[in-house]
Design a protein with these regions (language model features):
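Transmembrane alpha-helices of Major Facilitator/SLC transporters
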Residues: 70-72, 253-277, 284
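C-terminal ends and interior cores of transmembrane alpha-helices
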Residues: 95-113, 286-299
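Hydrophobic core of transmembrane alpha-helices in multi-pass small-molecule transporters
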Residues: 114-133, 302-318
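Cytoplasmic helix-loop-helix junction between adjacent transmembrane helices
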Residues: 122-161
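Glycine-rich segments within core transmembrane alpha-helices of 12-TM secondary carriers
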Residues: 150-174, 343-354
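Symmetry-related core transmembrane helices of the 12-TM Major Facilitator Superfamily/SLC fold
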Residues: 184-202, 362
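C-terminal transmembrane helical hairpin of 12-TM major facilitator-type secondary transporters
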Residues: 277-322
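A late C-terminal transmembrane helix in Major Facilitator Superfamily
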Residues: 330-361
Length: 362
């Protein structure tokens, strides 16, 4: 008589075990670190820092170079995580990203003179290594450390942590720049990146045998085909934040955006059906358009604190629903690809919005 095979019991009954918690904190720190760096130009413009305002038309190109760099390692991502130990790939990418922060600190201190093309190259490389670290973290490590029935929830939590990092990064950068030199923001960004690398290094990750038919360049873990309209919509929503990000250097603005995020989270908590409906996207887009109509008006920020709160709620709702749509369209085997596609839509949207804001300001 053949004995029936028993299903393998889950390794972790709860999503929030030690390994997942460390990866979650690493994701938050990485995002905060990147957005501390992105906040340097708006803060420098507001404070009239010579390095930042010396080339008025260059800021747009710095942001565009960063946006292009985000996609650089995408075709290699699947090969890298299968050819080498996936945790080490994330750690090394984070370390190289941290090295870019060190170079940025020398540049801002005036100790490393570089021309326009050197700065464009620096922003490109910074975006490339940051994106590689976050891609591997989200599309591979988080999935490896989550049970199959908890992976959508895990992806959802990570995306929210990245959004909080987008706001906490500039918030910390503004506070630090007011208490010390603008270049000291790089020190805080470096500390966040180093701690993130240490956290990832401490997580035990299982070894997996690489695929037999492995190609150096692949769309796996990079871009999900057939999702261009949703990619464009997500990119557009986050570009609105990037545009406002280009000229706002107020603690109150980012604090109220955090309130907007909490608003979106509460709406998810008490109305889960609403989160999974397309009505959520319409409401989110209405919130974003309402906020942007105020920011683009001649009166600017006159309506007060409610406008950034509305923008935060809209971006939070749109991001949450768009991510679920990416995952639902991918199927089980391409979850990592869907997560990366959503990530790149968000990050490139912010960078493009920054470029547009700098171009209009100039």
């Amino acid at each position: 008589m053949i004995k029936e095979q028993q299903p393998t019991p889950p390794v972790h009954k709860s999503l929030w075990h030690g390994g997942f918690a460390m990866l979650a904190l690493a994701a938050l720190l990485l995002a905060a670190s990147a957005y501390m760096l992105l906040a340097l130009i708006p803060i420098g413009r507001a404070g009239n820092v010579d390095f930042v305002v010396s080339q008025p038309t260059a800021h747009m190109w710095y942001s565009l170079a960063y946006a292009v760099g985000l996609f650089f390692f995408g075709p290699l991502c699947n090969w890298l995580v299968q050819r080498y130990r996936r945790g080490i790939v994330c750690v090394r990418a984070t370390e190289l990203y941290a090295a870019c922060i060190v170079v940025s600190w020398f540049v801002f201190r005036g100790m490393l003179p570089v021309d326009f093309f050197g700065l464009v190259a620096l922003r490109f490389i910074t975006g490339a290594f940051y994106a590689l670290a976050v891609m591997v973290l989200l599309n591979t490590l988080v999935i490896d450390k989550s049970e199959s029935n908890m992976r959508t929830k895990a992806n959802h939590i990570m995306a929210w942590l990245l959004r909080f990092g987008m706001v906490l990064g500039p918030l910390v950068a503004i506070v630090v720049s007011r208490k010390a030199a603008v270049s000291d923001v790089c020190v805080w960004a470096l500390a966040a990146a180093v701690i993130a690398a240490v956290l990832v290094r401490l997580v035990h990750l299982p070894f997996k045998t690489p695929e037999e038919d492995l190609h150096h360049l692949s769309a796996d873990r990079f871009l999900l085909p057939g999702m261009w309209r949703l990619f464009f919509f997500t990119c557009l929503c986050f570009a609105c934040f990037g545009y406002v990000f280009s000229f706002v250097s107020s603690v109150a603005f980012y604090a109220m955006m955090l309130v907007g995020f909490l608003w979106a989270l509460i709406s998810e908590r008490f109305n889960s059906v609403f989160v999974h409906s397309d009505t959520n996207l319409l409401v989110a887009f209405f919130f974003i358009l309402s906020a942007m109509s105020v920011f683009c008006s001649p009166d600017g920020m006159l309506p007060g604190y409610f406008t950034p709160c509305l923008l935060g709620a809209g971006i939070g709702m749109a991001g949450a629903r768009a991510q679920l749509m990416f995952i639902d369209s991918s199927g089980h085997c391409r979850r990592g690809t869907a997560v990366t596609t959503f990530l790149l839509a968000c990050e490139s949207g912010v960078a493009i919005g920054l470029a547009v804001g700098f171009a209009i300001a100039n």
